[in-house]
Regions:
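Conserved hydrophobic/aromatic pocket- or pore-lining residues that grip, position, or stack substrates
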Residues: 75, 117, 135
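N-terminal pre-P-loop "Q-motif" helix
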Residues: 75-90
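Interdomain "pre-motor" coupling segment immediately N-terminal to P-loop NTPase/helicase cores
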Residues: 11, 15-67
């Protein structure tokens, strides 16, 4: 059978990763030394990796993370920043997501709270988790608008489905009782189902 017929059939199925691997096998004579199962596995694995990378790419687009270049490996552990390196590396393992634990990152302006939160978010996306980043003030505004147009229930459901929600700049301005109640409902809906990271200038006791 002509290989072009096979390629056309692969294209009809939209197996783009499979197609690239198939062409690679045709052009590289070293593949002739592999068994049928080994070559088939290579084709399937290429398609799997292609789909996985597409999901990661899509999750990055939907995450709204501003600094997609933020990575945990570039965190500067200067003494004055008082960062717990072992704790941060532990967070990088994503075990907190698997355990559905929440994180509070607090510190003064310029200490890198947002960078750290986004670096963790970027790592989570690369590990296959869905992530959403939003400033707390923006979320509160979305909640108010959803109350007005009747879409509040759908908004709560939307924020509940992300495996990791990053709420940046919590408490940067005073929050009313209603705002606090609405925010608590969002967080409580996610409790024991997924994880939330909150960055704030406020001490944890506040």
């Amino acid at each position: 059978m002509n290989s072009s017929i096979v390629i056309n059939k692969i294209l009809e199925l939209n197996y783009k990763g499979f197609k690239e691997a198939y062409i690679r096998q045709i052009e590289d004579i070293n593949y002739n030394q592999l068994s049928f199962d080994e070559r088939l596995y290579d084709l399937l694995d290429s398609e799997y990796l292609y789909l996985k990378n597409k999901r990661v790419e899509m999750n990055f687009k939907l995450s709204r993370i501003k600094d997609k270049q933020a990575v945990i490996e570039e965190i500067d552990y200067l003494p004055q920043r008082k960062l717990n390196k072992s704790l941060i590396l532990s967070l990088a393992s994503m075990n907190f997501l698997k355990a559905k634990q929440n994180i509070i990152i607090n510190g003064k302006t310029g200490t890198g709270k947002s960078f750290l939160a986004q670096a963790i978010g970027n790592r989570a996306i690369n590990e296959g988790f869905t992530v959403y980043y939003i400033r707390t003030s923006t979320l509160l505004e979305e909640i108010k608008l959803s109350r007005i147009d009747g879409s509040y229930t759908n908004l709560v459901k939307r924020f509940a489905r992300y495996k990791l929600l990053i709420l940046d700049d919590f408490g940067i301005s005073p929050i009313s009782v209603d705002d606090a109640t609405n925010l608590f409902e969002i967080i409580e809906t996610r409790n024991q189902l997924s994880s939330t990271i909150i960055t704030s200038q406020l001490p944890v006791k506040d």
